[in-house]
């Protein structure tokens, strides 16, 4: 397929036109079980009526505004999440990589407030944290990092599911 989209993933030779519940349909009408959409991206399925209605309602009011302003639905959701999770604050992000970047920054900021100017973040082998510079550094796989140096410092890796590896760190 001739495309102007960067080749950042090994794409399969199929083009989807629409989805219904757990099913995707290609441009030839062939149906596929969607088991690869992304983690919690479409966890209620494609075109779920309640999700579609909520998106339509919000789109009719306001699509987007800067976080420099208060957004009523955002405040309502934050309140509900904090109530459920017994937390004081939430951080909304668009992707797992952005959430992990925020976690890295918050951990480093906390360390700085505690007087640690060179904090170390431990992650595990076999993990995946995203495709930003910090998150590929957090990912132990060298293959993910090749060609993107210099990478941020302060990450070490333990062997997943190996308590002795963690103790040695």
Where are these regions (language model features)?
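Active-site-adjacent loop/helix segments that line or gate small-molecule/cofactor pockets in enzymes
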Residues: 1-20, 68
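Short secondary-structure boundary/capping elements
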Residues: 16, 47, 73, 158-161
């Amino acid at each position: 397929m001739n495309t102007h989209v960067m080749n950042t993933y090994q794409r399969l030779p199929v083009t989807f036109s629409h989805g219904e519940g757990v099913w995707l349909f290609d441009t030839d009408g062939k149906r596929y079980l969607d088991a690869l959409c992304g983690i919690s991206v479409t966890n209620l399925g494609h075109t779920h009526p309640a999700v579609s209605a909520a998106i339509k309602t919000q789109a009719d009011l306001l699509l987007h505004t800067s976080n420099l302003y208060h957004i009523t639905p955002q405040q309502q959701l934050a309140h509900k999440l904090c109530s459920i999770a017994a937390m004081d604050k939430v951080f909304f992000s668009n992707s797992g990589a952005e959430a992990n970047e925020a976690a890295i920054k918050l951990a480093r900021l906390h360390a700085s407030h505690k007087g640690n100017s060179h904090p170390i973040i431990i992650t595990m082998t076999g993990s995946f944290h995203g495709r930003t510079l910090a998150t590929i550094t957090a990912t132990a796989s060298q293959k993910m990092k090749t060609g993107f140096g210099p990478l941020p410092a302060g990450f070490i890796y333990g062997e997943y599911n190996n308590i002795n590896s963690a103790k040695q760190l």
